[in-house]
Amino acid sequence: VAPAATLLPIKVFSGGTAASSAVTAGLDYAIASNARVINLSLGATSPTGDTGLRRVAATNNAVVVIAAGNDSTASPNWPSRYAKEAWANGTLISVGAVDVNKRLHTYSNKAGDIAPFYLVAPGVSIISSYGSSYAHMTGTSMAAPAVAGAAALVTGYWPYLRANQVSAILLTTADDLGAPGVDAIYGRGMLNVNRALAPIGSYTYRTITGAITRISLSTPGVVSYQPSVSSPSAFANVNTEVFDDYGRNYSSAEGAALAVRTALTVDGVLGRMDRLLDTSEQVLADGSTLLRLNSRAPDSKTQRATSPSQSLVSYQSAAGLSFSAGDGGLSSMTLGLMGSSWGHRLAGLDPILGNPLSNFAPEHRFASLGLPLVAGWQARAATLQSTRHRAASGDITLMEMGHVGARHAINVSTGDLSETGLLGGYSNSALGLNQATHSQGVTISGAYLVAPNWALAASYSQTRTAAPRASGMLTHATDIEANAYGVGVVRSDWLKTGDRLSLTVHTPLSARSGHLTYSVVQSVDETGSPQFGTQEVTLRPHAREWRTEARYTMPVRQWGGNLSAALSTRLHADNDEQAALQWVMGVRYQLTF
């Protein structure tokens, strides 16, 4: 069980018996030799050995594992019975024997009134030394060494534990047998070494400032992401020692849990096209327009359409007053230049024209109101509310000012992001990425009509995130600045009337500055006390992601459908300079009926 343990055989028997004085002398020798685990595969029908056991218990340095006896009695014999005494201080464990089917052996003494301090372990047909050879032996004297070995294993990993802590770990992690809970036959149940080595209760994170964060091991985990403006490698070196309810240290690669990489998908590339194709526009009698969209995602098992997962309604009066609302993250279709009278001309360029802050609420409901001003200017206010839970989520307020001329369109969008998370990053409370943060940004976008059917567009965004407060292991942070930009061109009526070709090149929001400082436990000393260090996280990546997209759609009027094709690539995906080039190409035909 504990192959690296050092064994110290101590003889207390003379012939077939052991005097109480011999047992006491043996225990005293074990104490003097600094033994951490003592196995007593012996027993008596009357009190014996308590003098030495009292001295061992007083040191709280050695776990004493004692065979329960083989008399088929309702309770263990001596000295195993001492385990329940107050002076034993929880350092003594009584052990019964079970067979391969986890049934108490006929001769094994039961737990009885020692049940809270009683375990069972394999003790039937155990190979043991016998004279100058080996033999299969049965009894509680065979079961006790298995528990002693487990105690040695726990002590070896965490030598700073006190004896009663080691005993408690073995007792509380036993597999329940017999009647539910602690019972008079099996006591605590069957020894489980794996559970004894695993953390118990909660993880405690400690910092040099004295801050403590506890996370229950029964708490459902969260999906962790690094901030999307950074790279998967940014947090790679954030490792720390964490402590369970018994103070045992475990190495935790906190940063590795954040190394999330995303991938292009055909649905992600073609899905936006299909949303555009699902849109219906109606011109009302007074000249106002009503835009409606209901998009259904197919069920992953049946591939049948489900209830609408995305919806949008947009109304624009003849005088220019507009109102839009929707669910499912479709705000980009009605905001910025896409929400202007040039929106139909710029279809396909939406990846570069939106305010990138809205990407931090990918699943949201929204409402917007647009007011016409003078000389082609329009103002718009919008609010986006995230519908995510236990993940990075943000509520966003946007204020926009736009102008549309005969050959040009411009839009300035300012955004205010109140986020639970950090720029798309999220984790448990230890890394401080599940707190409330605040970001502001501005996006300037413009489009120019090069020719009647050709439009060129470009955008630039700059954001600033206030330094996150100290939380969990996070002890210091700076403000975070990031930017994004892109260009695109779209041609309509290229090969046939009603078709559209668009090309875009852009780089998503990427950090230009920002640091996070974490206090970590690098190791523990011989007493189990944490030895602290720091880990610095630089959010600015070594490379930044570039995305290119080519899209083509055309109506197939004779069949009442639409043909869509797209090619999309990602260079340095997730701002990772080591990431392989990603590309997706897809073709889809959609028939409306």
Locations of regions flagged by a protein language model:
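Transmembrane beta-barrel architecture of outer-membrane proteins
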Residues: 306-310, 362-366, 393-398, 437-441, ...
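Substrate-binding/access-modulating region of protease and related hydrolase catalytic domains
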Residues: 9-89, 128-144
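Subtilisin-like serine protease catalytic core
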Residues: 1-21, 88-91, 112-116, 156-169, ...
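Outer-membrane beta-barrel channels and translocator barrels
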Residues: 318-320, 374-376, 404-408, 451-453, ...
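Outer membrane beta-barrel transmembrane domains
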Residues: 334-338, 342-356, 380, 411-436, ...
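Extracellular S/T/G-rich loop segment that most often corresponds to the catalytic His/Ser-adjacent loop
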Residues: 81-156, 160
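C-terminal subdomain of the subtilisin-like protease fold in secreted/lumenal serine endopeptidases
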Residues: 28, 33-40, 48, 91-94, ...
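Residues on the lipid-exposed face of transmembrane beta-strands in outer-membrane beta-barrel proteins
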Residues: 311-315, 367-371, 399-403, 442-448, ...
